[in-house]
């Protein structure tokens, strides 16, 4: 998480960047590892209620914090805690959203594969994801099907509010 937060705080982006980390009670020292940055808020996660998956429950708690502490944020970046972002990542995502008038943009980040099983399964996951949701197809505004890589998604706040947040997909 420390490398993720650092990569977000060091973005070449003209706008303000605020990071909210939900510490879901893991024993990996999330709060300490996240570091001490201006505009970083670490919030303790609450127990996982029935009907929610862990990741979406953490996202929902983070979004609650955004609504309280960043009510004027135009965009919200939802990202996994093990992704190291390139220095222009946020600027590129915002530029794509604005230039193409998209409500949500995502990117398939390079996933770290260190163990034998990660090296075996991660490429297969990406291959099958691309087969199920061909990138040109799901990126076509005229297509009835859309997909996003859940590890890095930038969404317009108004769009997220209009669809009711993540609660309606909480068990997926």
What is each of the regions a protein language model found here?
Residues 29, 79-96:
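Acidic donor-binding/catalytic loop of UDP-sugar-dependent glycosyltransferases
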Residues 44-69, 74, 93-163:
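Long helical/loop segments within the catalytic core of UDP-sugar-dependent glycosyltransferases
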Residues 25, 82-85, 111-112, 154:
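A short, conserved beta-strand element in the Rossmann-like catalytic core
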Residues 18:
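Cell-envelope/extracellular polymer assembly enzymes that use nucleotide-activated donors
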Residues 1-10:
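Short, well-formed alpha-helical segments that are part of the catalytic scaffolds
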Residues 146, 165-172:
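Donor nucleotide-sugar recognition loop
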Residues 7, 14, 23-32, 46-48:
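A conserved acidic beta->alpha catalytic loop
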């Amino acid at each position: 998480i420390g490398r993720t937060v650092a990569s977000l705080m060091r973005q070449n982006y003209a706008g303000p960047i605020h990071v909210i980390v939900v510490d879901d009670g893991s024993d990996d020292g999330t709060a300490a590892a996240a570091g001490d940055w201006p505009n970083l808020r670490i919030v303790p996660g609450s127990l996982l209620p029935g009907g929610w998956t862990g990741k979406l429950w953490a996202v929902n708690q983070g979004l609650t914090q955004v609504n309280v502490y960043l009510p004027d944020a135009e965009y919200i970046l939802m990202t996994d805690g093990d992704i190291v972002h390139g220095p222009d990542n946020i600027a590129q995502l915002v530029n794509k959203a604005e230039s193409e008038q998209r409500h949500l943009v995502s990117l398939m980040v390079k996933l770290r594969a260190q163990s034998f099983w990660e090296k075996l399964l991660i490429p297969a996951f990406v291959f099958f994801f691309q087969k199920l949701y061909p990138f040109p197809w799901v990126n076509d505004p005229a297509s009835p099907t859309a997909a996003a890589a859940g590890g890095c998604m930038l969404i317009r706040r108004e769009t997220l509010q209009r669809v009711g947040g993540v609660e309606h997909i909480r068990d997926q």
